[in-house]
């Protein structure tokens, strides 16, 4: 079976409400998508880095619990595993403070085997942050040469400090190497202020050629491909946005494998097929968003296993 390689930051999210601790869980769209794919019985590996501390153990245990291969997670000894403190106050916007310390040498990971038609998922600030950018992009370029399907999740967590001018070349390089780009409203507002998805696609993505899936939370997903634009409506009442997004992305990848859609097929996929892929992905999203764990139910996972 085709393999799935996920590349992203290993981070622990801790949530506080009105100054009281509420929950702690492994955060990030890439990490939670990897977990969902592992629950589906798909061969998925995580390429990342975390310290040999207790938080790092927690993160690695999370992946292993969800059947994600962790051989490509570098366990460094100098520093600490990153974690984000998310402060939720009634009537106020969430405030996020990021902690953690990486070593001087970054992304010293064991490269996973990548073959033609494998799927590589990457994104967020981890995919553009300068300390590991060069080594990470070498891996992405290798995956593209091997004719894997590359899926890019642009955007980054609220509270991340960055210089947009400095990271924009890396964002555009990621567009260029990708076959599919998936984002939501908050992503483009951060990267391209005062531009809607039409402008973002036409001004920044279309030139490079990837299919663009833009999510408007609670309303629809819009598919951009060449000159075609297709809107697929949905309704989601859950406020578990991380679970919903992870489920949706996992659903898209599941459909690419279930329908035997390969690297050479992406460019020629018709809008009708994309609409079916997205519609099915909504079911995965809804299931992962039902609880607080960001994970799909055992019953749903069993019902959607391939082969």
Where are these regions (language model features)?
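Alpha-helix C-terminal capping segments
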Residues: 34-43, 88, 255-257
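Positively charged, low-complexity intrinsically disordered leader regions
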Residues: 1-21
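Structural motif
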Residues: 3-5, 94, 118-119, 180, ...
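Short catalytic helix/loop segments, enriched in acidic residues and glycine
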Residues: 20-35
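Conserved N-terminal subdomain of the carbohydrate kinase-like
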Residues: 14-20, 42-124, 302-307
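Conserved phosphate-binding/catalytic region of the ribokinase-like
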Residues: 2, 142, 195-307
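Conserved beta-alpha-beta core of the PfkB/ribokinase-like small-molecule kinase fold
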Residues: 119, 124-199, 219-220
